[in-house]
Amino acid sequence: MATMEVEAAAATVLAAPLLSSSAILKLLLFVVTLSYLARALRRPRKSTTKCSSTTCASPPAGVGNPPLPPGPVPWPVVGNLPEMLLNKPAFRWIHQMMREMGTDIACVKLGGVHVVSITCPEIAREVLRKQDANFISRPLTFASETFSGGYRNAVLSPYGDQWKKMRRVLTSEIICPSRHAWLHDKRTDEADNLTRYVYNLATKAATGDVAVDVRHVARHYCGNVIRRLMFNRRYFGEPQADGGPGPMEVLHMDAVFTSLGLLYAFCVSDYLPWLRGLDLDGHEKIVKEANVAVNRLHDTVIDDRWRQWKSGERQEMEDFLDVLITLKDAQGNPLLTIEEVKAQSQDITFAAVDNPSNAVEWALAEMVNNPEVMAKAMEELDRVVGRERLVQESDIPKLNYVKACIREAFRLHPVAPFNVPHVALADTTIAGYRVPKGSHVILSRTGLGRNPRVWDEPLRFYPDRHLATAASDVALTENDLRFISFSTGRRGCIAASLGTAMSVMLFGRLLQGFTWSKPAGVEAVDLSESKSDTFMATPLVLHAEPRLPAHLYPSISI
């Protein structure tokens, strides 16, 4: 079966027109190699080293150089790529392998790259605290190069002068507390628009039995917020009377989420660069199409704004885009080129949309199935905020149970299986294992958050666990890396403060403003996870009934 799958895939690719002779030769060599290895995979393989079931992984005692972390024996040249291709999606294969081996650190070799996966908080802290400086770089991949405009932004660029420059810009000008406060009113406007939009959806039919697509609502709230902060606009196209997205806004979010799903997606040519251009799995084509879709919308706004500032037509700053364009160097010249502005605008957009929307969708799904948890959250909102005004960002410090629900969603249902990879700048040792220079270290979001040696009943949605040891103010960040909400360290998340505000306001407004219930005929919300990612397998659709006085649902401001 494995051989037939490889040969069928090869036949599909060979049907593509206009391949050069050298490309065909490379492809044939690759297919022959895979066919041979696929047959060889039928033979039993020797088991790999297992670690203790009660502690984080540690290597066997001995002398000499430390071993690599446990993992499958790699093949020459291609490493473990054949196993990866036959066990898609790759992240589920890696996690299953680690469970079977009983290890919290593992190594698979993809092409010539050692990929080290970690599911233990102690080892994760060793990477991002003790050795943060050595793991400060990023991999060079087709998707990251494309989405960063040739590594011109901060999040995706490898360690070097360009990353240092763009990171300074973000730290001093974009994610600083003063800038967060400066754009407070825009975030509030979008929270108000969210409230009215859901109200319109919930009341548009006389029967009142209207299903609300929570994923649609949550993602477009996040899209609205980032467009307002970045471009000072909710819409790229015509405003919608009900406050919802139009066709261009739907296209924008679809392209952004497609792009995020393609970043560091275990593409074969990222590990065998000589295959780049053949696009064996279609990855490169989809990356290009998604990037064009995002850039077509962003560039129209950025080009016009650049012209306005250069001509003197624009004089006052209103958003992040104005900040980036008007930055000056020591000589009074523009600090950023227009290409850097475009790359960083996309960077900021990618950083802020997926985590809040995913966490809120999962949390609401879990809570509809667990009325006691829902009741606790509603009681806190009624006690802290009441029903005579809408929840505001100033209420966030007091909404500890609401934040505990979001923390639990981050823990149990992370937005991605792994964090963005960290690349080792030099040979090092982690947890007693050898990690060679150039290795890609990935912290498993699902492995950390669901580690049974760290969490009691790890698969249970139980927000109270975050109140037992927390201080008076529950934070969405997790400093001990028992799970990952927003990444930390020198390559930490650029949108942690913004992401916290967006998550709590999105969740708070949905909970305070509406009573949520399962649609008629549905006994329980299906909490199945998608096979290809960590989102819900099916978008969450619920019945929403307004629970506040009608005058509190603000009118649409477009």
Swiss-Prot record:
Substrates-to-products reaction catalysed: L-tyrosine + 2 reduced [NADPH--hemoprotein reductase] + 2 O2 = (E)-4-hydroxyphenylacetaldehyde oxime + 2 oxidized [NADPH--hemoprotein reductase] + CO2 + 3 H2O + 2 H(+); L-tyrosine + reduced [NADPH--hemoprotein reductase] + O2 = N-hydroxy-L-tyrosine + oxidized [NADPH--hemoprotein reductase] + H2O + 2 H(+); N-hydroxy-L-tyrosine + reduced [NADPH--hemoprotein reductase] + O2 = N,N-dihydroxy-L-tyrosine + oxidized [NADPH--hemoprotein reductase] + H2O + H(+); N,N-dihydroxy-L-tyrosine + H(+) = (E)-4-hydroxyphenylacetaldehyde oxime + CO2 + H2O
Region described as Disordered: 48-67
Pathway: Secondary metabolite biosynthesis; dhurrin biosynthesis; dhurrin from L-tyrosine: step 1/3
Lineage, opening ranks: Eukaryota, Viridiplantae, Streptophyta, Embryophyta, Tracheophyta
UniProt keyword Oxidoreductase present: yes
Transmembrane segments: 13-33
Source organism superkingdom: Eukaryota
InterPro entries, alphabetized: Cyt_P450 (IPR001128), Cyt_P450_CS (IPR017972), Cyt_P450_E_grp-I (IPR002401), Cyt_P450_sf (IPR036396)
Subcellular localization(s) per the UniProt record: Endoplasmic reticulum membrane
Role: Cytochrome P450 involved in the biosynthesis of the cyanogenic glucoside dhurrin. Catalyzes the conversion of L-tyrosine to p-hydroxyphenylacetaldehyde oxime, via the N-hydroxy-L-tyrosine and N,N-dihydroxy-L-tyrosine intermediates. Produces the (E) isomer of the final oxime product.
The keyword Metal-binding is assigned to this record: yes
Signal peptide bounds: none
Family assignment from sequence similarity: Belongs to the cytochrome P450 family.
GO biological process terms on file: dhurrin biosynthetic process
Residues that hold heme b according to the record: R138, R167, H422, R491, C493
Cofactor: heme b
Protein topology in the membrane: Single-pass membrane protein
Gene3D superfamilies assigned to the protein according to its UniProt record, in alphabetical order: Cytochrome P450
PROSITE patterns, per database record: CYTOCHROME_P450 (PS00086)
Species this chain originates from: Sorghum bicolor (Sorghum)
Name of the featured protein: Tyrosine N-monooxygenase
Annotated GO CC locations: endoplasmic reticulum membrane
EC number annotated for this UniProt entry: 1.14.14.36
